[in-house]
Swiss-Prot record:
Gene name of the record: pdxS
Keyword Lyase among record annotations: yes
Organism encoding this protein: Bacillus cytotoxicus (strain DSM 22905 / CIP 110041 / 391-98 / NVH 391-98)
Domain of life: Bacteria
Entry's family note: Belongs to the PdxS/SNZ family.
Binding-site list for D-ribose 5-phosphate: 25, 154, 215, 236-237
Pfam families associated with the record: SOR_SNZ
Pathway in which the depicted protein is active: Cofactor biosynthesis; pyridoxal 5'-phosphate biosynthesis
Enzyme Commission number(s) from the entry: 4.3.3.6
Full protein name: Pyridoxal 5'-phosphate synthase subunit PdxS
């Protein structure tokens, strides 16, 4: 079984504290304050939301530290920031700034197409994306304290987040029903470390929280992901690319909390204005699919 150190328990515990909440992408102090006032449990500080990163193309990097510090100074809730996959120095810079979490994120252009960070080397906890139990288990083995679906960021299309959440949860059920002497073969076939699979089998769940991310654009989307077993919700472009960010932010927070109250969700959805413009996944070229980054 994976040896969980005291530091690792603290990191995982910090992520557990966000359970049931909404984490919102913000690009400045004003947006961070809107998110906090709407009830977000944390914010993700970055230069551009995923929809703008997708539209701009080119190489997407860690945000200017000035933006991160501005957001940190504006709110009392935890602040996260993204680094590129495998970028040792971006991660160290963000850690030195004092962020509460680092997202080793496929939304940014990977710095290393072979290696992810050894997240156990850092004091700050990490969140990482996953599409299946193999990716989830590898990130946990590297020291991730929190997971999220990859979805397809910046599209306003929930279909990929749904696919990833269902896939991970189906595979958790499969692992739970395997005999222990069958786990090694399963580990070989999925690329999932055996010790992590053993921990998942014994717990009957992932040992870290798994949030929904990538395509959440409406209160109903958020409630859907919670019903599918998400521990909480990340909203990237869905808030500040909508017609009325303040209303959307509050509505998504409420829908995440009361995800089985359909009358409330109906009322929350009234008069919100237009959600962000969505993208049909089938129209994306292979190189435009952010979820394919990392392994």
């Amino acid at each position: 079984m994976t040896n969980v150190t005291g530091t690792e328990r603290v990191k995982r515990g910090m992520a557990e504290m966000q359970k049931g909440g909404v984490i919102m992408d913000v690009v400045n102090a004003e947006q961070a304050k809107i998110a906090e006032e709407a009830g977000a449990v944390a914010v993700m500080a970055l230069e551009r939301v995923p929809a703008d990163i997708r539209a701009a193309g080119g190489v997407a990097r860690m945000a200017d530290p000035t933006i991160v510090e501005e957001v940190m100074g504006a709110v009392s809730i935890p602040v996260m920031a993204k680094c590129r996959i495998g970028h040792l120095v971006e991660a160290r810079v963000l850690e030195s700034l004092g962020v509460d979490y680092i997202d080793e994120s496929e939304v940014l252009t990977p710095a290393d197409e072979v290696n992810h960070l050894n997240k156990r080397d850092y004091t700050v906890p990490f969140v990482c994306g996953c599409r299946d139990i193999g990716e989830a288990a590898r990130r946990i083995a590297e020291g991730a304290s929190m997971l999220r679906t990859k979805g397809e960021p910046g599209t306003g299309n929930i279909v990929e987040a749904v696919r990833h959440m269902r896939q991970v949860n189906a595979e958790i059920r499969q692992v739970a029903n395997l005999r222990e002497d069958e786990l090694m073969t399963y580990a070989k076939n999925t690329g999932a470390p055996y010790e992590v699979l053993l921990e998942i089998k014994r717990l009957g769940r992932l040992p870290v929280v798994n949030f929904a991310a990538g395509g959440v654009a409406t209160p109903a989307d958020a409630a859907l992901m919670m019903q599918l077993g998400a521990d909480g919700v990340f909203v990237g472009s869905g808030i500040f690319k909508s017609e009325n960010p303040e209303k959307f932010a509050r509505a998504i927070v409420e829908a995440t909390t009361h995800y089985e109250d359909y009358e409330l969700i109906a009322n929350l959805s009234k008069g919100l204005g237009d959600a962000m413009k969505g993208v049909e996944i089938s129209t994306l070229l292979p190189e435009q699919r952010m979820q394919e980054r990392g392994w």
